Each structure stands twice: as structure tokens, then as C-alpha cells.
């Protein structure tokens, strides 16, 4: 049916219609760029303002949260745009972090370059991980990616993360483990928080640009079905693999930023369950709106930190988390971001009504 | 006997009993022992422990907290009370960095005492050095805890512990071929058995290492692999949670009859003999990092008294607790020698580095800190053997580890004028 | 080859573990379309309940029954009360819901019992089959042999249930198309109850045996569900005999891998590698057009 519509329908356009369509299109385009600017502006503003209100504990926590938001944005692209489940994002984060650490310690490259190396590494691995997706149904793909995360867990526990040594693995023997060198423009914790916010804004902008161009349209068609996509002339292999690559890039950048925040990464923190939690909390945050990735990062790091700060027993916090996850899944199908956006829209509508009905 | 005198006699008997029990526990002694509560400006002391995770290491901070409570009830630090803040790093290096930042940069602690964590040494040692704050840790585990300028563990550490266990096996069982099983955790798996190996090389004993994945579901294959190397002693070198299923697997394969089993310090815990069962009765020797929990020395008794009077009933009375008590006592006695108005981070760190003859019957030898680049002052310990549902002491007392890696520590000891 | 035989036998114990868990997972998937991440957690809490009761000198059989009852009740609670609320969502979200439940159960278990080294001893531990092999002596305890037997029995029982009983037919219909089945008059709640009850019972039995064969530690037992998924994948989430065979093969290969010089440190990755290999080789499960 959709194939017929695209290929067969002929539409007659006359001058009147064009005169109405063009300003409408311009209006929509303006609106789109406005929301784009709003997104970038909000993230940069958050990054600027947060260090003023946070003590050292919260600066570190929120830096981790923003780094994980970068990775969560990648998960949101795959699930929100294409409906594909990736349960190995945290493993890709680890792979990116590994590459960034190795390059930073071994070649002493500038931090930005290390982050890009991390991103590109995870992009490549992500594209490989996405190859099974060409033949798999939803839950099966989820299981495949979970198996990959399990494999990564074992490998990284054997290899460990680079900490200043030589050789392929870069592990130091017999002397002090080194911390990753921070970027020259942001050595302090507060400055680094702002730096990570800039990267988050850049990554979100990159994703948004994808969504608004041919890539986004191709993804929407692929989501409707292979036949629709092929009939429209979309190269499924290229665009689907590219989506996995983009998600991997987000994970790699997030991993490099996390490595820079803490200084070291530890293999024990990369269990397969972390990838599953990241997917779960990204869904809770919301996969269609950019704020969902931000909320996912906060849920992953800031909420547990809050509970720890209040001295809540770690296991009671786990119970609370599980219950909150269930509750969010049940009551908020479009995620917390969806609920917030809906609430904002309702508020705006009510204000507009009040303004219009006022004498 | 006059019936009317019975109640009075009972009362007298009760009073005598109370006095006797009081004498058995002893009154907890700490700090200035004035019996008066301290009420000055608080001194901030912090601790980072691994509580939520594969194991709960918070006993050392609990013991230190009890000691500091006792100090506060007994005149404080020359009138100033101690405010002791404990943070849980949840076995995650990221969280460890966050909570250490909170303690050092937000709460501005002057020293940390009673830390016990698997992950915080690696994550925080550099920050502690950069901020000039000393850590008198309860228990250190991975290598980074024993190779940091500002981190001073009270315990001897896994490498020393396994070395002493190997030395015991060679002496008692004339063992010439040993296998050391250790989890492949970074900075532990490639370090913990190396002391035994190096000692063995210099003494004609062959020691091989098997590194295991702590998340593995298959303990039997590991024990079979160890047995296939035909050792006469197996050195178990892992946390007690991993130890119990491996000993169970060894028992099911009947290995206790052919091979001697010894372990490093983590096995010295009240729950272990019951969990591993009667098969290992008198068949499993364990190294201790401190003197036994039931030793009769006055400081050991004081530790128990402090916990009874100022700790919670649920606080474990284990070796982590001993370590936390000793750490808190060391910090308290150092602070007491300082001018209470001049207690800040720099002066406290200075004073701590000068500690050179701290004695406690919990420790085998006098403890010191010094200005070296690393700290491993406790490098001796006794052995105990599993007996029924508990442990029995082994003759021989404290054994000093003969680990070639300790050469720089011995040099530091000479510099401080110790033997 | 001689050196590998002892490990083949010791691998059968772990293999039985994976096989049983795999069957438990596939059963629920085939009847409700949900991958149960809480399978391990439900088994773990059952095992801890059994341990506590045995510590208080309860008779063995009652302790085991209490363990299985705990798992069944918790599973029913989720299946009847929480799972229906997620019913309109897609299968992945429904499976993530069980993850939330797993965290609640795991957190409760760890908080209640704490981290003390424990061992769940079963009476079948003291008896064993002895093998004196060239590569070394090996003993296969009755518990592990029992695990193997139970895996096969469970597989046969579930296969019978699904193919020969009315309830089984209804379960298969529900897994196929829930809405259509409801329209046809199948009482959805009733069938769901049976499915979650069965899954809970399997979880309880698996939990007891797992706690004995592996380790009585809640977090480890909960996340052993991930390698168990590997066994389920070998069975394509459909075939129970293939799941059991897959689980046993995975266990045996993981044990034998200890003898491969370069691969030994990575041997815990064996379940994942085998699952990935199976998926890449499988030709089915084409994407819908």
C-alpha cells in the first residue's frame, strides 16, 4: 500500500497551493531550527550553571551522569528511531574508553583526539555488532547484543584497562597506575563538567542533524518495514549499519569522557547487567526526545548518588530502583521525557487559552 | 540461715556478679580517659569502605567509629570531639572517587582512618597525595594500597599473607611443590601470589599460580586443574565468599586426603569453619594478619570492650574490626600529642609520618609510618588451624615474611632506627 | 584427550545448571512471550529460605518445599499483578519489566541475609560416582547427577504439557497471539497463572541446585541467568531438547577450555561464544517485511 502511494500517486500543484505551502514550510523549518537551538542552548546552560550549585561530590557525580547521557543518546537512536534493541551499549562504552585510555597513555595525544579515537573504535565495533540485526527479530537481537556484552565482560576482566604501561594492553606492572590526562582547557573537576556538557550538546546536535536529513527519513522507512524501505529506494544495509555506527560512536565518546572523569576504568564495573540497566533506564527516560538521554544519565548516576548521600543502604536503594523502573515502565510509555514534554505542552495550551479568553 | 537474709544475700551476690563481669569486660579505655564528654570544635575524620557489593568490608569503619565515640565520651582530642564520616564506595571505582571527593574536598577531613576497600586505593591514592591527606587504613587489599605515599594499611596485605602461608607449609609439611589459586582481579591476581613465588625460588620450593575468574560458576574444574599439577600444598588466596565453594569442590573431589591446604588471611573469619564443614578439621591452616581474635592481651581486650560499650551488637568482631580499632587508636594518640588549636591537614600528616613506635598486642611488631614512598609496616603474622567450628592456634607465634619485594621497606625501617 | 576427560565430567555439573535454567526460561517464553530476567533472583531467594530453615533444623523435604513455594508465590505475584499491566507493550519492554522485579527481589535478599559465606549442603552431596581416569581422579556427586536427570525430566514434562494437555495448547495459543486468543475465549488470566506458576517452580528447583553446585550468593545466582540465556538461544527459544543439549555442551566446553593454553582465562565467555556462533549459523528468524 505504501509502495503504491510513493511510486504511483500523481499530485497536481498549481500556483495558489505553492504560495500557501512555501511560507508554511518556512514556518516549520524555523520552528525546527528553534527547537534545535533550544536543545543545544539548554544543555550548554546546564553545563555552565551546575558547577555553581554543586559541591565536589555532586560535580563528580553529574560529570559521570552527563558522560553516560552521551551513551544513552545512542541507545535512544537505535530504539526510538529504528525500534532495535541494543543490550550492549555499556560494553561499547567500555571499548571506547579502552581505546581512549590506550591512546592517551601510549601516544600522549590531546584529549579531544583521544575522545574521537574512542568514538571511532566503538563506531566500528558497533557496526559489526549491528550486522546480525539485518536478519533478526526484536527480542532475538536483544539477546545477541546481551551475549556480546557478556563476552566483553569476560574479555575486559582478563585484559583490564590501560593504566600507563607498555605493550598492546598497556597495563603497568610494578609501579603506580596512571590516571588519564585531562584536556588542557579543563583540568579541574568543575571545568571538566562544563567540557562534558559541551560534548553532550555536540553529540545531541549530531543525532538531531541525522534525524532531520535523509538518514532520519530512511530510518523511519526502515522502521515501517523492509518492503517500504526498499520500494522507496533506501539502502537498508547502509542506513541500518550507520545507525549502529552512530550509537557506537555515542558510546565510545561517553566512555572516553567517563575515563577522563574518573581517571581510570575498572573491568569489574563492566558487567553485562550494566548494559541491560542502561537500556532499561534509557527507555524510562524516553527514547524519542533528547531530554530522555539526559534523564537516563541522571537516573544511572545521580539518583543512586543521592540515595548514597542520604546514607540509604545500597541494597534498599536497589529495591527502590527496581520498583521505580517497574513503575516507570507501566505508567510512562513514552518515558519521563515524554511525560515532561506532554505536561509542558498542556501548560502552554492552558496559558494560551487563558490569554485568548481574557477580555 | 535466716530466711529474711536471703534477699539481702541475693542482692550481694548480684552485685558481686556485676562487679566480676565488669572486671571481665574491663572498662573501655580510649583517648584521655576522663569520662567527660568533649564539647569543642569537631575534628573531621573520614573513611571509605566497600559495603554494598561482593562482600561487606565495613567492620573496620564500625570499629573505628566505636573507638571515636569512646574518645568523645572521654574528653575528646584535648577537648575537641571527633566527627567521623564513613562513606560506602559500593565496590565501584567511580563511586569511590566521588565519595572521596566529598570527604576530602567538601567535608575537609584532616585525616582518614579505618578505610577498607578493594577499589578505592587505585581510584584515590593520587588524589590523597595531591591533597596532602594521610589515610591510616584498616585493611588494604590490592597492590596500590601498599605502594602509595599517603596510604598506610594496618594489615600486612595479601602478598605477605600468602608468603607466610607458603613458609608455614614448607616448614610443617616439608612441601616442595605448591599451587597458589587467586582471583584475576587487577593488581591482585598478578601480585598476590608473587611473594610466595619469589620466596620459594630462593628456598627451593616451586610455586605455580592459577588465576581464576571470580564470576565463574565452575569451581570443580579449577580444583581439578590445580590437582593436575600434582602439588603437595595448595595455597587458597581469595575472599571468603569465593573460598567456601572452592573448598566444597575440593571436598567433593576428595582432595583433602592427598594435598595439604593452607590459606591467606581472608579465611580467618568466624563463619568459615562452619561453612566449609568438618571435612577440613585440623586440615586447613590459615595465616592471620594480626594476633588471634581471642588473644588475652590488654589491647585486644580493650578492642572488645570498646565495641561492646560503644559499638552496635551487629558489628562483626573480626580482623577488619581489629584493624579499624588499631587505626583509630593510632590516629587518636597522634592527635593527642598535638596542640588542639593547630590541628589541620598538613600538621596532622606531618605528625603521622613521624610515628615510629606504635605498640599494640594486636600487632606482632611495633607499627610505624615514616616518610617512605610506600607503607607496609605490618609484615608478620601467626598461623591458625581450623578446629571444629573455630580455629586453634598453631605453635610458632608470629612469623615474619621473607619476601624479596620488602627490601625497600626494610631500608625504611633501618632509616627510622628500627630493627 | 585423556587429560580432558576429568574436565568433561566436571563440566556435566555446570552443564546441568545451564540446561535447567535454559528450560525454565524457554518455558515462560513459549507461554507468555516474556524473557524472565528474574528467574535467577527467584531461585536465589528460594535457596536462601531453604538455608535459613535448614539452619533452624527443619527437615530437608520441608525446607526444599518452602524454597520452591517462595519462588512460586513471588512468580505468581509478578505474573498476576504486574505483568498484565505491561501486557500491551512490546515483548522487549515486558522482559525489561522482569528486570525491575529481579532488582527488587535481589535487593531484598541481599539486605535481609547479608554477605556472610554460606553453603547449601544437600544430602546427595556426600555420595558420588567415582572415576579413576588417566588424567586424574574425578568424582561426580549425586547432586550433579540429579541435576542432569532433573534437566531431562523437566524437559520431558514440559514438552508433554505443551503438546498433550489443554492448558499447554492454550499456553501456546497465548504466546502466538494474545489478543486473538482472548477473542477466541481462552481465559487469559487462568493460563497466565499456570505459566508463571510453572516458571516459579522451575526457578525454585534450579535455585536450590544452583546454590549447591555453584555458590550460595544472591547477586551471582541472579546474573547467572545471562549465560543461561545462551543455552536458551542454542535451543532457538523454541526447542527444549536443543536447550538441554546446548546447556550441557556449553558447560562441558567451558570446563574443558581450562586446558586450552591461550583460551583458559577467557573460558567464562564460552556460553556467549557458543550462542553467538549458533545465531550466526542459524538461517531462520527472518525479519518481517
Residue map of PLM features:
Chain B
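Beta-alpha junction/loop-to-helix N-cap segments that form part of ligand/metal-binding clefts
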Residues: 28-34, 56-62, 74-145, 154, ...
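Hydrophobic alpha-helical segments within soluble ligand-binding/sensing domains
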Residues: 31, 96, 154-178, 190, ...
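Extracytoplasmic "Venus flytrap"
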Residues: 31-65, 87-94, 116-117, 181-191, ...
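An alpha-beta-alpha
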Residues: 151-214, 233, 311, 322
Amino acid at each position: 500500500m505504501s509502495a503504491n502511494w510513493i511510486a504511483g500517486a500523481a499530485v497536481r500543484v498549481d500556483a495558489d497551493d505553492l504560495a500557501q505551502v512555501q511560507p508554511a514550510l518556512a514556518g516549520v523549518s524555523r520552528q525546527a531550527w528553534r527547537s534545535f537551538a533550544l536543545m543545544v542552548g539548554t544543555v550548554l546552560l546546564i553545563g555552565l550553571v551546575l558547577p555553581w550549585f554543586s559541591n565536589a561530590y555532586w560535580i563528580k557525580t553529574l560529570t559521570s551522569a552527563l558522560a553516560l547521557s552521551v551513551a544513552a543518546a545512542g541507545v535512544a537512536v537505535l530504539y526510538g528511531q529504528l525500534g532495535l534493541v541494543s543490550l550492549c551499549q555499556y560494553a561499547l562504552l567500555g571499548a571506547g574508553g579502552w581505546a581512549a585510555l590506550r591512546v592517551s597513555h601510549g601516544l600522549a595525544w590531546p584529549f579531544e583526539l583521544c575522545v574521537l579515537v574512542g568514538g571511532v573504535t566503538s563506531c566500528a565495533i558497533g557496526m559489526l555488532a549491528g550486522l546480525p540485526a539485518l536478519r533478526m527479530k526484536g527480542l532475538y537481537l536483544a539477546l545477541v547484543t546481551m551475549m556480546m556484552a557478556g563476552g566483553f565482560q569476560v574479555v575486559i576482566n582478563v585484559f583490564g584497562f590501560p593504566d600507563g604501561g607498555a605493550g598492546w594492553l598497556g597495563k603497568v606492572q610494578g609501579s603506580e597506575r596512571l590516571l588519564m590526562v585531562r584536556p588542557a582547557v579543563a583540568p579541574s573537576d568543575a571545568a571538566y563538567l562544563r567540557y562534558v556538557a559541551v560534548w553532550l550538546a555536540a553529540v545531541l546536535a549530531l543525532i538531531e542533524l541525522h534525524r532531520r536529513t535523509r538518514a532520519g527519513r530512511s530510518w523511519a522507512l526502515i522502521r515501517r518495514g523492509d518492503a517500504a524501505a526498499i520500494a522507496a529506494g533506501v539502502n537498508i544495509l547502509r542506513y541500518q549499519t550507520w545507525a549502529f555506527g552512530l550509537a557506537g560512536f555515542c558510546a565510545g565518546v561517553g566512555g572516553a569522557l567517563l575515563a577522563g572523569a574518573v581517571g581510570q576504568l575498572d573491568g569489574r564495573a563492566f558487567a553485562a547487567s550494566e548494559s541491560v540497566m542502561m537500556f532499561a533506564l534509557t527507555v524510562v527516560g524516553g527514547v524519542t526526545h533528547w531530554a530522555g538521554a539526559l534523564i537516563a544519565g541522571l537516573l544511572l548516576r545521580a539518583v543512586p548518588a543521592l540515595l548514597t548521600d542520604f546514607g540509604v543502604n545500597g541494597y534498599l536503594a536497589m529495591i527502590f530502583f527496581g520498583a521505580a523502573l517497574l513503575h516507570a515502565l507501566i505508567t510512562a510509555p513514552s518515558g519521563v521525557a515524554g511525560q515532561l514534554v506532554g505536561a509542558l505542552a498542556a501548560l502552554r495550551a492552558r496559558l494560551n487559552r487563558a490569554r485568548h479568553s481574557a477580555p | 540461715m535466716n530466711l529474711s537474709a536471703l534477699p539481702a544475700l541475693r542482692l550481694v551476690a548480684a552485685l558481686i556478679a556485676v562487679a566480676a563481669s565488669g572486671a571481665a569486660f574491663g572498662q573501655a579505655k580510649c583517648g584521655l580517659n576522663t569520662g567527660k564528654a568533649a564539647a569543642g570544635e569537631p575534628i573531621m575524620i573520614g573513611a571509605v569502605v566497600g559495603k554494598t557489593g561482593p562482600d561487606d568490608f565495613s567492620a573496620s569503619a564500625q570499629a573505628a567509629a566505636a573507638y571515636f565515640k569512646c574518645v568523645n565520651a572521654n574528653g575528646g582530642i584535648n577537648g575537641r570531639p571527633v566527627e567521623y564520616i564513613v562513606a560506602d564506595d559500593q565496590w565501584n571505582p567511580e563511586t569511590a572517587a566521588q565519595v572521596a571527593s566529598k570527604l576530602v574536598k567538601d567535608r575537609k577531613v584532616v585525616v582518614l582512618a579505618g578505610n577498607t576497600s578493594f577499589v578505592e586505593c587505585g581510584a584515590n591514592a593520587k588524589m590523597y597525595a595531591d591533597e596532602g591527606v594521610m589515610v591510616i587504613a584498616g585493611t588494604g587489599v590490592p597492590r596500590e594500597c601498599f605502594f602509595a605515599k599517603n596510604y598506610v594499611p594496618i594489615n600486612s596485605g595479601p602478598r605477605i599473607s600468602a608468603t607466610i602461608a607458603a613458609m608455614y607449609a614448607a616448614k610443617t609439611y616439608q612441601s616442595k611443590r605448591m599451587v597458589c589459586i587467586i582471583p584475576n582481579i587487577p593488581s591482585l591476581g598478578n601480585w598476590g601470589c608473587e611473594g610466595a613465588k619469589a620466596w620459594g625460588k630462593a628456598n627451593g620450593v616451586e610455586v605455580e599460580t592459577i588465576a581464576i575468574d571470580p564470576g565463574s560458576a565452575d569451581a570443580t574444574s579449577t580444583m581439578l586443574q590445580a590437582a593436575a599439577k600434582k602439588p603437595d600444598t595448595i595455597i587458597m588466596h581469595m575472599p571468603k565468599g569465593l573460598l567456601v565453594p572452592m573448598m566444597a569442590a575440593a571436598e567433593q573431589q576428595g582432595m583433602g586426603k592427598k594435598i595439604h591446604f593452607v590459606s591467606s588471611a581472608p579465611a580467618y573469619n568466624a563463619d568459615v569453619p562452619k561453612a566449609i564443614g568438618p571435612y577440613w578439621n585440623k586440615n586447613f591452616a590459615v595465616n592471620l594478619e594480626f594476633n588471634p581474635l581471642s588473644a588475652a592481651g590488654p589491647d585486644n581486650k580493650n578492642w572488645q570492650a570498646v565495641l561492646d560499650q560503644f559499638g552496635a551488637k551487629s558489628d562483626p568482631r573480626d580482623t577488619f574490626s581489629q584493624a579499624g580499632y588499631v587505626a583509630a587508636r593510632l590516629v587518636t594518640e597522634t592527635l593527642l600529642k598535638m596542640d588542639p588549636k593547630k590541628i589541620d591537614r598538613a600538621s596532622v600528616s606531618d605528625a603521622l609520618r613521624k610515628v615510629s613506635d606504635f605498640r599494640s598486642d594486636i600487632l606482632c611488631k611495633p607499627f610505624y609510618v615514616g616518610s617512605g614512598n610506600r607503607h607496609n609496616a605490618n609484615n608478620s603474622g601467626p598461623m591458625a588451624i581450623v578446629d571444629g567450628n573455630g580455629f586453634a592456634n598453631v605453635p610458632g607465634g608470629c612469623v615474619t615474611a621473607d619476601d624479596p619485594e620488602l627490601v625497600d621497606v626494610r631500608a625504611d625501617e633501618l632509616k627510622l632506627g628500627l630493627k | 584427550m585423556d587429560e580432558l576427560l576429568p574436565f568433561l565430567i566436571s563440566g556435566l555439573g555446570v552443564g546441568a545448571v545451564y540446561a535447567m535454567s535454559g528450560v525454565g526460561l524457554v518455558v515462560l517464553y513459549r507461554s507468555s512471550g516474556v524473557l524472565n530476567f528474574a528467574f535467577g533472583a527467584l531461585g536465589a531467594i528460594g535457596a536462601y529460605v531453604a538455608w535459613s530453615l535448614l539452619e533452624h533444623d527443619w527437615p530437608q523435604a520441608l525446607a526444599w518445599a518452602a524454597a520452591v513455594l517462595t519462588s512460586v508465590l513471588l512468580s505468581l505475584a509478578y505474573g498476576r499483578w504486574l505483568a498484565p499491566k505491561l501486557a500491551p507493550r512490546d515483548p522487549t519492554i515486558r522482559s525489561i519489566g522482569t528486570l525491575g522485579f529481579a532488582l527488587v527481589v535481589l535487593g531484598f535478599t541481599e539486605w535481609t541475609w547479608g554477605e556472610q559465606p554460606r553453603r547449601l549442603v544437600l544430602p546427595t552431596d556426600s555420595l558420588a560416582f567415582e572415576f579413576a581416569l588417566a588424567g586424574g581422579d574425578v568424582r561426580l556427586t549425586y547432586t550433579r547427577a540429579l541435576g542432569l536427570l532433573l534437566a531431562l525430566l523437566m524437559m520431558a514434562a514440559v514438552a508433554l504439557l505443551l503438546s498433550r494437555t489443554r492448558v499447554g495448547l492454550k499456553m501456546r495459543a497465548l504466546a502466538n497471539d494474545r489478543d486473538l486468543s482472548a477473542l477466541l475465549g481462552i481465559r487469559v488470566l487462568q493460563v497466565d497463572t499456570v505459566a508463571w506458576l510453572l516458571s516459579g517452580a522451575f526457578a525454585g528447583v534450579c535455585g536450590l541446585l544452583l546454590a549447591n553446585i555453584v555458590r550460595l550468593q544472591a547477586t551471582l545466582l541472579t546474573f547467572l541467568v545471562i549465560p543461561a540465556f545462551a543455552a536458551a538461544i542454542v535451543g532457538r527459544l523454541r526447542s527444549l531438547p536443543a536447550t538441554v543439549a546446548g546447556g550441557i555442551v556449553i558447560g562441558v566446553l567451558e570446563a574443558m577450555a581450562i586446558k586450552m593454553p591461550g583460551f583458559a582465562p577467557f573460558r567464562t565467555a564460552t556460553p556467549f561464544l557458543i550462542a553467538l556462533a549458533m545465531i550466526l549459523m542459524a538461517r531462520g528468524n527472518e525479519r518481517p517485511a
